[in-house]
C-alpha cells in the first residue's frame, strides 16, 4: 500500500500539533534525498542554505496555495509537490517551476492538466478490457493461462475513511517510505509503457467510462487473480523463477500506481463519497462472484485437460478403425450433446446424411468463430499488458488480494459479466463434446480448435493424424497387392524367356471347383452383411460403404470371367505363354548367346595382345615431335587455300571453261578497243587466286546509260557479244583482216606463175 503526500497533508490538518511536526519531517528528508538523485527541476527549493526552512515552509504553505489555484481553475506545480513522490521524479512529463519570480508560467500549464484528466479514461477502459480478456483466457486456454492484473487508477471508495484510519495513515513507518522511494525510481521505464498503452486505446472507450468527482489521491492497487491462476503461473515458470523473491514485482506494481496517481490534491471531499462506499461494496461482491466463476472454470478445464490426454492414448490404440464408423459414432454423440447443452433440452434423434453434413459445417463455423475471438482477445491482452506479465503470480497473495478490485464503475461491472457468460458457453460445450468422443478422426477434428493456443499440442495431434493416415494407406496398399497376387487375370513377364518358373497362363479349373468357390464367396458376403447390420444401422451407412459393395460385386463378376469361359481360339500353352513367339527354342538359350558374345570379345583382345614386329606402330602413341610437324603441315595447307590476310582471306576458285574463256578475253583486251591501250601481260598461264567481276555505275549518276539487271550477263564474253558497238567494231575488223588475207593469197599466186614461166 502506497500512501501519497496528499493523504499526509489531510491527516496533518486533523491531527494534533505533534503529529503535524513528526510525520512531515520524515517524509521531507526522504523527499530531499530522492530529489537529489532523480529530479532536475527542484534546485530552487533544495539549496544547502535553506534545507530545513524549505521543509517546514513547503508543508505549511502547501494547502493554502492549492486552495487558491483550484478556485481560479488553474493548475500549478505545487499540486505536484503535494501529490506524491512520483510527481517530483517523473522525467518524461515537463515540470514547470513555480517560484516567487516565475509565476507567469501558471497560465500555460492549464492545458496539460486538462490533458492529464482526459487521459484517465483510457486507463479505466483498459482495466475493463483486461478483466474481459482475463476471463476469456481462463475459460478458453487449457494449456496457456495468461494471468492479468486489474489496476484501479482512482480508488474512489478508499477516499472516505474514519478518523481512526486517518490517524493510522499519518504515522507511516520508514520501511513503507523506503519502499515507495524504491518504487519511485522505476517510473522512467514504466511511463513509456503507460504512454504506449494510452496510444493503443480506442476513442470509443473514452465515451464509455465516467469519472466521478471526489478525492482521487489515495490509491490501493491489488491484483485480481484467483488461487488457480497463481498455481498455473507458477507451473508455467521455470524452477529458477519460482524460488526467486518477489521484490521486483511488488516494486514495479507500486511504481505503476505511483505513476498513475493524479495530482489534484486540493479538492475537498463531497457528498458523493458516501455513495462511493455503497458502490465499492457492490463492486467487491461482483468481483468475488467473478473470481468464483473463474475458479470453477479453471478446475473444470484442468479435469478436461487430463481427460484429453487420456483420450490421446486411446486414439493411438484405436487408429486402425475405419473412418466411416468413427464419423457415425462421433456424429451421434455430437448431436446428442448439442441438444443436451441447449437450454430447451429437446429429445435426441438421429439425422440423415445431408442434415449431418450441415450440422458438421455449423459446428466448424462455431468453433472457428470462438477461436478467432479468443485469439484476438489474447493478442490484445498480451500487447497491452506485456509489462505486467508476472504480477499475478508474483503478488504472493491468495484470497487476500482478490476482493480489492476498486476503481470500476457499475456499468463496467455489468458489462464485464455479460461477455464472460457468452464466451464460456461455447467453450464448455466444445470441451464436453471432446470428452466422450473416443474415435480418432472426429476427436482430432474437435480438439484442433482448442490446440490453436499451444504449439506442442498441435504438433502431437498432427503426428497422430499422419500416423493414422499412413497406417490406413499402408493397409490398403497391402490388401491391393495381396488381391492382385491372388486373383490376377494375367501376368506380365518383363524378361521373356529367362524366368520359366512362373506360370504365364491360368489353368482351366473344373466346374465343381468353380461352384464350390462361388458358394464360399456367397457365404462370406452373407457373413459380412450380417456383421455390418449388427454393427451399423441402415440409416448410418455412408457412401463409402456403398461404393465398396459395388466394387466387390464387380470384382466377383470379373473373377468369374476366367480363361475357361472365354474361347480365344488359340492355345497359350503351345505358344509358350503370353509372349507369342513362334521361335521359342531360339529365345530359351538367351543367356548362352550373351556369354558367347563376351567370349568373342575376349578372344579378339587376346589376339591383339600378341607381340608382332609391327606392334610398336599399332599400339603406341606417336611421339610429340611428329605430331608437331603434322600440325604445321595442316596449317600450311589451310593457308594455301586462301590468298592471305592482305587479300582478306580470298579463296582460290575452281577453274571451269567459262572462267578460262574470261581469262583469255582479258589477255587480249588490248585488241578489243583501239582507243584504249593496256600493258602487255607477262604471265603465261592462268593465275591461282582471282575473282572476276563487273563495275556497275551508280544509278543516280548514270541512270539512262546504266545496264538494267535483265540485260546484265554472267560472263565477260557474253557481255562483249551483247554490246552493239563491240559487234560493229568486230565486224569491220574482221572484214579488213579477211581482205588482207585474200590479197596476200593472190600475190602469192602471181609470183608462182612467174617462176614457172622463167
From Swiss-Prot:
Region (Disordered): 1-176, 231-277, 312-353, 377-480, 501-552, 621-647
Cross-link (Glycyl lysine isopeptide (Lys-Gly) (interchain with G-Cter in SUMO2)): 210, 317, 345, 384, 560, 586, 608, 628, 651, 660, 688, 733
InterPro entries linked to this entry: Fcf2/DNTTIP2, Fcf2_C
Compositional bias (Polar residues): 1-21, 155-172, 231-255, 321-353, 431-440
Residue spans of biased composition, Basic and acidic residues class: 377-387
Gene Ontology biological-process annotations: ribosomal small subunit biogenesis
Keywords: Coiled coil, Isopeptide bond, Nucleus, Phosphoprotein, Transcription, Transcription regulation, Ubl conjugation
Keyword Transcription in record: yes
One Pfam assignment: Fcf2
Annotated region (TdBR region), positions in chain: 550-607
Bias (Acidic residues) ranges: 515-550
Positions where Phosphoserine occurs in the chain: 17, 133, 137, 140, 173, 183, 229, 240, 248, 255, 324, 330, 476, 512
Bias (Low complexity): 128-143, 447-456
Stretches assigned to coiled coil: 512-541
Function comment: Regulates the transcriptional activity of DNTT and ESR1. May function as a chromatin remodeling protein. Part of the small subunit (SSU) processome, first precursor of the small eukaryotic ribosomal subunit. During the assembly of the SSU processome in the nucleolus, many ribosome biogenesis factors, an RNA chaperone and ribosomal proteins associate with the nascent pre-rRNA and work in concert to generate RNA folding, modifications, rearrangements and cleavage as well as targeted degradation of pre-ribosomal RNA by the RNA exosome.
Assembly and interaction partners: Forms a ternary complex with DNTT and core histone; interaction with PCNA releases DNTT and H2A/H2B histones from this ternary complex. Interacts with ESR1, ESR2, PPARG and RXRA. Part of the small subunit (SSU) processome, composed of more than 70 proteins and the RNA chaperone small nucleolar RNA (snoRNA) U3.
This protein's name: Deoxynucleotidyltransferase terminal-interacting protein 2
Origin organism lineage: Eukaryota, Metazoa, Chordata, Craniata, Vertebrata
Amino acid at each position: 500500500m502506497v500512501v501519497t503526500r496528499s493523504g499526509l497533508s489531510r491527516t496533518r490538518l486533523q491531527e494534533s500539533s505533534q503529529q503535524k511536526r513528526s510525520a512531515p519531517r520524515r517524509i521531507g528528508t526522504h523527499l530531499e534525498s530522492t530529489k537529489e538523485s532523480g529530479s532536475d527541476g527542484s534546485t530552487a527549493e533544495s539549496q544547502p542554505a535553506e534545507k530545513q526552512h524549505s521543509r517546514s515552509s513547503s508543508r505549511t504553505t502547501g494547502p493554502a496555495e492549492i486552495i487558491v489555484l483550484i478556485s481560479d481553475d488553474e493548475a500549478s506545480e505545487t499540486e505536484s509537490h503535494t501529490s506524491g513522490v512520483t510527481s517530483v521524479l517523473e522525467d518524461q512529463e515537463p515540470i514547470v517551476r513555480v517560484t516567487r519570480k516565475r509565476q507567469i508560467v501558471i497560465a500555460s500549464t492549464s492545458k496539460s492538466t486538462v490533458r492529464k484528466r482526459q487521459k484517465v479514461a483510457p486507463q479505466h477502459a483498459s482495466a475493463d478490457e483486461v478483466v474481459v480478456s482475463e476471463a476469456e483466457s481462463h475459460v478458453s486456454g487449457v494449456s496457456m493461462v495468461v494471468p492479468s492484473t486489474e489496476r484501479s487508477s482512482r480508488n474512489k471508495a478508499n477516499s472516505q475513511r474514519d478518523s481512526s484510519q486517518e490517524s493510522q495513515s499519518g504515522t507511516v513507518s520508514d520501511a513503507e517510505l523506503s519502499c515507495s522511494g524504491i518504487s519511485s525510481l522505476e517510473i522512467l521505464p514504466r511511463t513509456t509503457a503507460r504512454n504506449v498503452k494510452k496510444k493503443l486505446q480506442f476513442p470509443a472507450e473514452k465515451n464509455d467510462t465516467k469519472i466521478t468527482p471526489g478525492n482521487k489521491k489515495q490509491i490501493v492497487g491489488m491484483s485480481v487473480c484467483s488461487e488457480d491462476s497463481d498455481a498455473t503461473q507458477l507451473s508455467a515458470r521455470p524452477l529458477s523463477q519460482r524460488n526467486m523473491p518477489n521484490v521486483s514485482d511488488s516494486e514495479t506494481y507500486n511504481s505503476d500506481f505511483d505513476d498513475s496517481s493524479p495530482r489534484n490534491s486540493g479538492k475537498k471531499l463531497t457528498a458523493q463519497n458516501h455513495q462511493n462506499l455503497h458502490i465499492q461494496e457492490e463492486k467487491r461482491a461482483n468481483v468475488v462472484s467473478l473470481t468464483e466463476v473463474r475458479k470453477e472454470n479453471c478446475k473444470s478445464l484442468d479435469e478436461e485437460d487430463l481427460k484429453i490426454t487420456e483420450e490421446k492414448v486411446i486414439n493411438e490404440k484405436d487408429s486402425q478403425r475405419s473412418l466411416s464408423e468413427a464419423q457415425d459414432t462421433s456424429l451421434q454423440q455430437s448431436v446428442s450433446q448439442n441438444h443436451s447443452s441447449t437450454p430447451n433440452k429437446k429429445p435426441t434423434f438421429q439425422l440423415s446424411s445431408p442434415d449431418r453434413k450441415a450440422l458438421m459445417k455449423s459446428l466448424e463455423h462455431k468453433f472457428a468463430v470462438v477461436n478467432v475471438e479468443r485469439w484476438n482477445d489474447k493478442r490484445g491482452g498480451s500487447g497491452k499488458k506485456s509489462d505486467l506479465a508476472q504480477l499475478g503470480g508474483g503478488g504472493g497473495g491468495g484470497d487476500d488480494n482478490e476482493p480489492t478490485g476498486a476503481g470500476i464503475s457499475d456499468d463496467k461491472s455489468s458489462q464485464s459479466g455479460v461477455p464472460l457468460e457468452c464466451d464460456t458457453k461455447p467453450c464448455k460445450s466444445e470441451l464436453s463434446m471432446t470428452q466422450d468422443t473416443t474415435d480418432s478422426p472426429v476427436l482430432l477434428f474437435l480438439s484442433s480448435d482448442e490446440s490453436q493456443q499451444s504449439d506442442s499440442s498441435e504438433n502431437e495431434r498432427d503426428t497422430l493424424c499422419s500416423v493414422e493416415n499412413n497406417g490406413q494407406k499402408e493397409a490398403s496398399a497391402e490388401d491391393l497387392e495381396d488381391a492382385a497376387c491372388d486373383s490376377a487375370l494375367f501376368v506380365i513377364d518383363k524378361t521373356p524367356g529367362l524366368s520359366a518358373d512362373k506360370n504365364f497362363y491360368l489353368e482351366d479349373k473344373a466346374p465343381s471347383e468353380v461352384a464350390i468357390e462361388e458358394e464360399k464367396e456367397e457365404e462370406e458376403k452373407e457373413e459380412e452383411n450380417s456383421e455390418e447390420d449388427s454393427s451399423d444401422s441402415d440409416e448410418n451407412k455412408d457412401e463409402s460403404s456403398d461404393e465398396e459393395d459395388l466394387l466387390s460385386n464387380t470384382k466377383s463378376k470379373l473373377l468369374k470371367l476366367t480363361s475357361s469361359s472365354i474361347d480365344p481360339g488359340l492355345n497359350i500353352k503351345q505358344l509358350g505363354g503370353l509372349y507369342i513367339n513362334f521361335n521359342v527354342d531360339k529365345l530359351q538359350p538367351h543367356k548362352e548367346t550373351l556369354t558367347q558374345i563376351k567370349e568373342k570379345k575376349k578372344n579378339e583382345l587376346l589376339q591383339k595382345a600378341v607381340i608382332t614386329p609391327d606392334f610398336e606402330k599399332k599400339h603406341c602413341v606417336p611421339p610429340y615431335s611428329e605430331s608437331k610437324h603434322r600440325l604445321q603441315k595442316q596449317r600450311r595447307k589451310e593457308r594455301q587455300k586462301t590468298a592471305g590476310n592482305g587479300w582478306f582471306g580470298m579463296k582460290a576458285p575452281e577453274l571451269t571453261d567459262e572462267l578460262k574463256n574470261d581469262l583469255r578475253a582479258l589477255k587480249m583486251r588490248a585488241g578489243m578497243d583501239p582507243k584504249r591501250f593496256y600493258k602487255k601481260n607477262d604471265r603465261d598461264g592462268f593465275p591461282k587466286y582471282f575473282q572476276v567481276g563487273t563495275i556497275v555505275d551508280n544509278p543516280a549518276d548514270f541512270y539512262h546509260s546504266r545496264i538494267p539487271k535483265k540485260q546484265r550477263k554472267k560472263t565477260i564474253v557474253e557481255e562483249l557479244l551483247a554490246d552493239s558497238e563491240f559487234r560493229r567494231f568486230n565486224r569491220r575488223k574482221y572484214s579488213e583482216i579477211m581482205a588482207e588475207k585474200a590479197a596476200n593469197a593472190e600475190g602469192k599466186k602471181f609470183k608462182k606463175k612467174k617462176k614457172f614461166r622463167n
